[in-house]
């Protein structure tokens, strides 16, 4: 049995840039989410999973003083602030790996960022609309004109809330890698924004012209890879977690229920499989990068959430 020495110290965990990882703030937001689920009458098991998310965090304190998480329970709820922070890090790391490899294999490839939208919908229509959105995306990317110069893509479904109209705006962001020939060929290869709009309207099977945006990913400041990662962020925006806003939480939870928000195609899909990258949405949220230093080098640290003091307190033990 492990014996831990009580330190009664508040957890302090900083990233490589010296910024506080703010475990406490994220935990408090997760507890707020659990309270809202309770207010909305969701089942006890769901509420309990969110309430206990990140209750105990086990780290290795390394020689340089940095902490390495090696064990924790995360609830994996679609709206959980704690889990979405972990997913965001994992997604950024995996996207970086995929893009690095794709550029090595196709150095002349160019990157585009495509946004596909539909009309805003009320909360009760959100789930069905997201299904329609992803099915329409599949139809669009099966078209010969799209496939012709496509090397690979990653797509993400995002939903934003219009507070004034009390509606939701589901849309798809797509990072595309295309052959350089996409930009040549007197109309045979290049697809204008207007043509993307027409093809998206046909794929959606709607009687209105949906908004579409297509642009090249350009090197600005951070270089090409930095611009790509900035463009392809994890598709979850923070939502206001208070009881007055509870219906938005309910609508988003029901709308995203059993929906895959991320998808890969072409070379990106092949690379992801080759690198054996785990599922960002439902997979492990402890290991979010390749920071897998020898775990035996350091001191075991356990940080436990104190519900009364509303903070994480540290206990530690030398490694046997």
From Swiss-Prot:
The Gene Ontology biological process terms listed for this entry are: DNA replication
The alphabetical list of record keywords is: DNA replication, Plasmid
Indicate yes or no for the key word Transmembrane helix: no
- Name the cystine pairs: none
Please name the InterPro entries in this protein's record: Rep
Where would one find coiled-coil regions in this protein? none
Keyword Hydrolase appears in the UniProt entry: no
Give GO terms: molecular function aspect only: DNA binding
**Record-annotated membrane-spanning stretches:** none
Describe the function of this protein. Answer: Produces a single-strand nick in a specific site of the plasmid, and this nick results in single-strand replication by rolling circle mechanism.
The text of the family note is: Belongs to the Gram-positive plasmids replication protein type 1 family.
Per its record, how is this protein called by name?
Answer: Protein rep
Natural source organism: Streptococcus pneumoniae serotype 2 (strain D39 / NCTC 7466)
- What lineage is on file? Bacteria, Bacillati, Bacillota, Bacilli, Lactobacillales
Gene field = rep
């Amino acid at each position: 049995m492990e014996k831990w020495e009580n330190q009664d110290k508040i957890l302090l965990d900083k990233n490589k840039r010296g910024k506080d990882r703010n475990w406490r703030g994220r935990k408090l937001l997760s507890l707020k989410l659990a309270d809202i689920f309770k207010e909305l009458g969701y089942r006890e098991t769901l509420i309990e999973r969110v309430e206990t998310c990140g209750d105990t965090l086990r780290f290795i304190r390394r020689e340089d003083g940095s902490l390495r998480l090696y064990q924790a329970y995360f609830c994996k709820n679609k709206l959980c602030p704690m889990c979405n922070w972990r997913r965001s890090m994992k997604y950024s790391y995996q996207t970086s790996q995929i893009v690095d490899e794709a550029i090595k294999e196709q150095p002349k490839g160019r990157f585009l960022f495509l946004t596909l939208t539909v009309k805003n919908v009320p909360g009760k229509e959100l789930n069905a609309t997201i299904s329609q959105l992803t099915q329409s995306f599949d139809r669009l990317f099966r078209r010969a004109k799209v496939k012709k110069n496509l090397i690979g893509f990653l797509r993400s479904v995002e939903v934003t809330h219009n507070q004034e109209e009390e509606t939701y705006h589901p849309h798809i962001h797509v990072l595309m890698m295309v052959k350089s020939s996409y930009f040549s060929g007197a109309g045979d290869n290049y697809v204008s924004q207007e043509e993307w709009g027409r093809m998206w309207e046909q794929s959606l099977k709607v009687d209105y012209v949906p908004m579409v945006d297509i642009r090249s990913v350009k090197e600005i400041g951070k270089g090409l890879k930095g611009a790509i990662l900035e463009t392809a962020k994890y598709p979850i925006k923070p939502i206001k977690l208070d009881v007055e806003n509870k219906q938005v939480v309910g609508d988003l939870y029901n709308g995203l229920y059993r929906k895959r928000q991320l998808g890969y195609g072409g070379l990106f899909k092949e690379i992801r499989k080759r690198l054996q990258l785990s599922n960002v949405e439902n997979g492990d949220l402890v290991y979010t990068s390749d920071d897998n230093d020898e775990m035996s080098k350091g001191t075991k640290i356990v940080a436990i959430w104190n519900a009364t003091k509303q903070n994480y307190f540290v206990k530690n033990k030398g490694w046997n």
